[in-house]
Every structure is written in structure tokens, then in C-alpha cells.
Amino acid sequence: MAVELTANAVQAVAAGQNVLFTDAPVKCSRGYVVHRAGAGLVTLRGACNGCASVARYKVMFVGNISVPTGGTAGAISVAISIGGEAVPQTTATATPAAVGDAWNVATAAFVDVHRGYCANIAVRNISTQAIDVANANLMVERVA
């Protein structure tokens, strides 16, 4: 089971806000991964088979980030968040030398969801300023 969510157009993402995903080229037919078009939150369900006590998902994000016009060139970052909190180990940082210079970043994490529970994930701008995000691609794969 795999899901792919995308947003190709450039979007302005304020500091502390989530990247929005507008399209779902690959959808989950079992209801394990739930997403509303245009939203930034993705819900992972802890539906388990047999004796398993957790459902494990591999979450991967790839996209282009840049400092928008009016911003200050310097380090900008995104990270995968779980339950509204950024996971520090998933921080993807780029340091554009000029406003508008786009950098490709990627990050991934395993997310365990206990049987009967759900987890909300997102890709969050953890920079201190707004960023532009283009060609955003979030892939979620159930691996166990």
C-alpha cells in the first residue's frame, strides 16, 4: 500500500505552517492513509493485521524550496511533523545565496502508529521566515 501526494505549483508557506498537497496521483484504497485535497495534514491509521501492535509507515518528502521575494537569503528548512511537532532528525536545510534560488531537499522517517490509534503528519516550514515550495512530493508507504 502506497500513497503519493503532490503540489507542483509554487506555494508560499509561512513560518511554522504546513506545505499543502493538491493532488493524489496514487491513492490508498484501504483507508489507511487519509488526506483531503488542498490540505497539509495527512492521517495515518493504526489498522493492524494479526498479532501486530503497530502499523509502520515510511514517509518521504522531496521538494524545491527557496526564499521568496522580500525575504532574506540564508538558511531555510522544512521537517516532517508528527502530531504537530517537527521531528528534528527529519530537518532538511538549504542555504540559498540569493532570493529566488531554489534548492531541492529530501527527508524521510518511519512513523509507528499503535493499533486503534491515528497519527497526523505534515511537512512543516520550520524556518523563521516564509519560504516558497514547488514540486512538493510526499510519499507514504505502509511497510509493516
Cite the ranges covered by each PLM segment.
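Extracellular jelly-roll beta-sandwich "head" domains, especially the C-terminal globular C1q domain
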Residues: M1-A144
